[in-house]
């Protein structure tokens, strides 16, 4: 904010390239990073986790149940045609689809949420039987309400993601005002439809 526009744009590009691992050898950097994410996911999957319990000094105390046979995913994926690709760059998360109806407790934000070019900040959300039933934001509460009450499924969780504290995006100290970047700064949850991150999920019908 204290830089001229041209300097700010240059600094932003530097931050984007650094957090996206565009180094002298980005292919090698991403191969190593993908392997690290896959190893983390494999370890988490080996634990056969039935529930995640989030507890923090900011007041968060939240339980969310996992779908049986759900899998942690992260990093590069392989398409049904056998093509290996990275769906998101940058990406620091190991994510999983939670069980609908199995979320209880309260979650407090540790970072602001950029939504529709506005910031929702200093907010909390209380869940009961999987659904967001109560919430409040000190900044842009009406926008948070709009997000949660968008449609029938928007008050239920579709993703829980684990992100290391030493994530390059978190270490940068920058709020990018872009979810693809900002979600990779900390552990997070997402409302709405879940990904089929479940054993043999791509072969299942919606029913």
Where are the model-predicted features located?
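Dual-mode signal for accessory low-complexity, basic/Gly-rich regions
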Residues: 134-203
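Active-site bordering "gate/hinge" segments
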Residues: 1-104
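Short solvent-exposed loop/turn micro-motifs enriched in small/polar/acidic residues
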Residues: 45-47, 116-119, 153, 182
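Long, well-ordered mid-to-C-terminal structural blocks that present hydrophobic/aromatic surfaces
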Residues: 96-146
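Structural beta-strand/beta-sheet cores of well-ordered domains, especially the beta-sheet scaffolds
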Residues: 50-52, 60-62, 103-105, 111, ...
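Short, structured patches in soluble enzyme cores that scaffold and shape functional sites
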Residues: 56-58, 66-68, 111, 136, ...
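Flexible loop/turn segments at secondary-structure boundaries
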Residues: 1-2, 60-63, 71-73, 114-117, ...
């Amino acid at each position: 904010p204290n830089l001229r526009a041209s300097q700010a744009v240059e600094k932003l590009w530097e931050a984007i390239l650094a957090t996206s691992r565009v180094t002298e050898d980005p292919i090698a950097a991403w191969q190593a990073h993908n392997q690290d994410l896959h190893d983390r996911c494999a370890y988490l999957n080996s634990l056969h986790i039935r529930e995640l319990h989030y507890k923090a000094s900011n007041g968060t105390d939240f339980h969310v149940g996992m779908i049986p046979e759900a899998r942690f995913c992260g990093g590069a994926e392989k398409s049904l045609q056998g093509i290996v690709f990275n769906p998101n760059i940058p990406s620091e998360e190991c994510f999983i689809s939670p069980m609908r109806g199995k979320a209880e407790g309260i979650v407090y934000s540790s970072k602001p949420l950029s939504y529709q070019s506005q910031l929702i900040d200093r907010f909390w959300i209380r869940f009961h039987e999987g659904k967001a039933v109560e919430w409040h934001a000190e900044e842009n509460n009406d926008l948070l309400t709009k997000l949660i009450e968008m449609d029938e499924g928007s008050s239920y969780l579709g993703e829980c993601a684990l992100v290391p504290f030493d994530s390059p995006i978190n270490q940068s100290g920058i709020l990018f005002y872009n979810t693809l970047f900002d979600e990779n700064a900390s552990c997070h949850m997402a409302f709405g439809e879940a990904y089929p991150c479940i054993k043999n999920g791509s072969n299942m019908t919606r029913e």
